[in-house]
């Protein structure tokens, strides 16, 4: 997989309560230099946020109210494991932010992620971090990487999943689910929509969305080299174009936007 430039800044925004962050009922953190683990009680409605730069992020359902976030570091071609560290920060309403940071001049908070993948003397530090998250029912999750696949399975609330070089696959029985990448496919599935608009983007890849049959939305789909396919009856608006499809599903309302350059876009009814 091709790597991104050595330094990057990714602005991110997440609407959250302004309430003072509260400590989890039970927490534990361990970092032995190669493996990292955090576990704690996270209430429904709170957020778990995980940010990575090189490596995958995988989310699976947990049992009970205890969340578990673990990571393993792997060095390639002389990578320095000691130059990659983990940070944790309690969030409002009992949530948690966990970040993997490369280099001394990196930082991470709720609103931004800056990680500089340089080792000694400006040389690239070839270390990958693989995150695994066990997610309690009703907890929202925001996970992201730069070079790596992102997968969310068995979520029951809101999901935001992003990467740059890799595929994104996200499934939630709740919603909404939003997903973006640049070089990779997007697959998103939800049985409920929650509130808010829906956004899906890639450049080199296809987009497939499995959506509730009751969907009502104002839809805009865009591609350059690809096509459109939908299971939903749509009232078209504007000029019909092989590169752009806009219209209304059901009664309209929320916005559903999906765009790619090289790939197709498919809307399917959830089974």
What is the role of each PLM region?
Residues 1-10:
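Bacterial N-terminal signal peptides that target proteins for export
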Residues 209-213:
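Loop/turn-rich, solvent-exposed surfaces of beta-rich toroidal or solenoidal domains
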Residues 150:
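Short, small-residue-enriched loops and turns at beta-alpha junctions
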Residues 9-17:
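Bacterial N-terminal signal peptides
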Residues 21-51, 56-144, 153-154, 160-162, ...:
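Acidic (Asp/Glu) and glycine-rich low-complexity loops/linkers
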